[in-house]
Amino acid sequence: MKSTRRDSPRAFKAVAARLGSVVLAAAFVLPPAVAGATRYAGEFLRVGAGARALGMGSAFVGLADDGTAAYWNPAGLATLPDPQINAMHAEQFGSIVQYDYLSYAMPVGGTGKARQGLAVSLLRLGVSDIPDTRGLEFLDQNGNGVFDYPEDRLLVDESKFVFDSANDFALLLSYSRELHPGLALGGSLKVVRQWLGDSLSSNGFGADIGALWVGSHGWSAGAILRDITTTQILWNTGTNESVSPTLRIGTAKSHAFKNRRHVVTAALDIQVGFNGEELSSQASVGSVTFEFHPGLEYWLDRKLALRAGMDAANFAAGAGVRIHRFGVDYAYLDHRDLDSSHRISASYTF
């Protein structure tokens, strides 16, 4: 639901300038704080939520206008007019990896009160039939009882393989409040639980904070700082991992044509990382990296949608159908190195 406040384009420029200053400040302040972060820790938290946003190249931080806002930008929960359930299932890389997402979001607060929103979300990533080859025998050329590569040769006996599974879970508890008409602030608390086979497990805790501005003439802008506390993941082996903060800013512009039968939305997200992943990013300045996520969405009578975008360097596209209160969305995600994947999600608005 868009605010009825009549903001001018000048107000939008002011907000955009402020968001830009936040990016620059974070670029100088955050890197020293995350120097001890573990690269790729908590990677499953980055898979995404909802085929609608994914079909737009994940350009959703500046839009965040449905129940998946709890994942993309929790500040958007304050703009929800009605409760909503969202669910998504995906299988990636030849069905090796399975991913599930489920959320319930609802507005709170009565007439005359500041709009607020609550949500609970569950994310799961699982990999089955992982071969554990640690029990295999080998020819010990050095006689030291240790497998030395490449001198020693492994004796592969598939009958001795032990198959395990890995499961990663995350529970998000999210809250948002409208500070004044058109501007909302929100946050999420995250609880992470991971298992690898029967012997390895970990627990983790973290938090996200986001802001969303909704103006007139179809403009909106938002920002989210994920893992603001540097999410800690503690393994039962005594090993500790940490997920470094990432800053993501976004803006969106919607325009309606012909009695609002046709609505086109253009969106752009920019993700700023501080973990020095230069090889996997599109641009970098020192240890600060940048990814760009442009996206488009077209609605016909708010019943049929077509989408396209770029998820960093990977092409994305999708479609959606709304029938009364029920919706189904599909997303196609290309990958420059691995197989493409398909996402299907469903939503119900009460």
Stretch-by-stretch model annotation:
Residues 37-350:
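Subset of outer-membrane beta-barrel
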Residues 18-31:
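Bacterial N-terminal signal peptides
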Residues 32-36:
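Signal peptide processing junction and immediate N-terminal pro/mature segment
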Residues 14-17, 142:
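Polar/charged alpha-helical tracts
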Residues 8-11, 25, 68:
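Hydrophobic residues within membrane-embedded alpha helices
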Residues 7, 29-30, 72, 292:
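Selective for proline/serine-rich intrinsically disordered segments
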Residues 1-15:
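N-terminal secretory signal peptides that target proteins for export/translocation
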